[in-house]
From Swiss-Prot:
Belongs to the GHMP kinase family. IspE subfamily. This is 4-diphosphocytidyl-2-C-methyl-D-erythritol kinase. It comes from Treponema denticola (strain ATCC 35405 / DSM 14222 / CIP 103919 / JCM 8153 / KCTC 15104). GO terms for molecular function: 4-(cytidine 5'-diphospho)-2-C-methyl-D-erythritol kinase activity; ATP binding. ATP binds at residues 96-106. InterPro entries: GHMP_kinase_C_dom, GHMP_kinase_C_sf, GHMP_kinase_N_dom, IspE, Ribosomal_Su5_D2-typ_SF, Ribsml_uS5_D2-typ_fold_subgr. Transmembrane segments: none annotated. Keywords: ATP-binding, Isoprene biosynthesis, Kinase, Nucleotide-binding, Transferase. Its EC number is 2.7.1.148. Pfam families: GHMP_kinases_C, GHMP_kinases_N. Pathway: Isoprenoid biosynthesis; isopentenyl diphosphate biosynthesis via DXP pathway; isopentenyl diphosphate from 1-deoxy-D-xylulose 5-phosphate: step 3/6. It catalyses: 4-CDP-2-C-methyl-D-erythritol + ATP = 4-CDP-2-C-methyl-D-erythritol 2-phosphate + ADP + H(+). Catalyzes the phosphorylation of the position 2 hydroxy group of 4-diphosphocytidyl-2C-methyl-D-erythritol.
Length: 284
C-alpha cells in the first residue's frame, strides 16, 4: 500500500568510543567506535508529490544547502528502486550541525526507511545498507536504532548491549567542526597500519566509570579549540561519571548515574552554554 505521508524521527548519536586507525587506499579511514543513539532528534514529515520528479526540502528553522543528505538519499533510492514520483520533506532541525552527532546521516537514513515504507518497495536490509553507504559512512548505522560497535569506514556494524540507565547532558559550544579538517589534524598516513587499543565489546556492558573509552580526535581538537576542552571539563566538574567529545566534534557529552546530580548540573551548564541539551540513551 502506497502511503501519502509519513512522519519520521531521526535520532542523534554519540560516540562512547572512537579510535581512528590507518588511512585506507580509498581515502577513507578505518575506525573502531561505539555508536549509541540518544533521545535528541530531528522531526521529518515526508509527503508524496505525484506530479513532481524531485525532492523538495522545507526547513523553517535552518537553511539547508541545495545538496544535502535528504535530497541525496532520495536520489540514490529513486535510482536504485526505480520510483518516479517526487516528495517533499519538512524538517524540524533539533540536532546541531558540525557537532559530531550524525544529524545529517540520521536524516538520510530516516528518509531511506520512509521511502521504502511509503512506496512499498520492499528493499532488503542489505540493499538499504548499500544505498546508505553511498551517502555517507555513518548512514548505515542509523538504519537501526541500537547501540553498535562500528568498524571499517562504517560498513561493519555489530549490535551490542550498553547499560543505558544514565542521564545525559550534551553541550554544543557553537563551533562547527569539519570532519575532513579533523582527520587532517590527526595526520594519519595512507595505508598506515594501526592496531586497536582494545576490543570495545568487552566493556560496553560495564558501568561507565569502568570504561577505558576515548576519542582519538580530542587531543588535536582541544588544542585547536580550547572551548571544547573546557566544555568537557565543566561536565566532569559538575559531577558527570563519564564525559567525552562526540565524533569529530564539537559537541561533548556527560553521562550521570544520579538524577539529582544531573538536574543540578543541567541548570548550571544551561546558564553558561546556550546550546545545552538533556538526553537519554536509546541503547538497550
Amino acid at each position: 500500500m502506497i502511503k501519502s505521508a509519513i512522519s519520521l524521527k531521526a535520532h542523534a548519536k554519540i560516540n562512547l568510543h572512537l579510535e581512528v586507525l590507518g588511512k585506507r587506499s580509498d581515502g577513507f579511514h578505518d575506525i573502531v567506535s561505539v555508536f549509541a543513539p540518544i533521545s535528541l532528534a530531528d522531526e521529518l514529515l515526508m509527503q508524496r508529490k505525484p506530479d513532481k520528479k524531485e525532492c523538495k526540502v522545507l526547513s523553517p528553522l535552518a537553511e539547508l544547502p541545495a545538496e544535502n543528505t535528504i535530497t541525496r538519499a532520495y536520489e540514490e533510492f529513486k535510482n536504485f528502486a526505480g520510483i518516479s514520483e517526487g516528495i517533499s520533506v519538512r524538517i524540524l532541525k533539533r540536532i546541531p550541525e558540525g557537532a559530531g552527532l550524525g544529524g545529517g546521516s540520521s536524516d538520510a537514513a530516516s528518509v531511506l526507511r520512509g521511502l521504502n515504507d511509503m512506496f512499498s518497495t520492499g528493499l532488503a536490509e542489505e540493499d538499504l545498507r548499500a544505498i546508505a553507504l553511498k551517502i555517507g559512512s555513518d548512514v548505515p548505522f542509523f538504519l537501526g536504532n541500537e547501540a553498535a560497535v562500528v568498524r571499517g569506514r562504517g560498513e561493519t556494524i555489530k549490535r551490542v548491549s550498553v547499560f543505558s540507565d544514565y542521564f545525559g547532558i550534551l553541550i554544543y559550544p557553537e563551533i562547527k567542526s569539519a570532519t575532513p579538517r579533523a582527520y587532517s589534524l590527526l595526520g594519519r598516513k595512507e595505508s598506515e597500519i594501526l592496531n586497536p587499543a582494545f576490543n570495545p565489546e568487552l566493556f560496553c556492558g560495564k558501568d561507565c566509570r569502568e570504561w577505558p573509552f576515548f576519542n582519538s580526535f580530542e587531543d588535536v581538537l582541544f588544542t585547536e579549540y580550547p572551548a571544547i576542552k573546557k566544555a568537557k571539563q565543566d561536565l566532569l566538574t559538575n559531577g558527570a561519571d563519564f564525559a567525552l567529545m562526540s565524533g569529530a566534534g564539537s559537541s561533548v557529552f556527560g553521562l550521570f548515574k544520579n538524577e539529582k546530580t544531573v538536574k543540578n548540573a543541567y541548570s548550571k551548564l544551561l546558564a553558561e552554554y546556550g546550546r545545552c541539551f538533556f538526553f537519554l540513551l536509546l541503547a538497550f
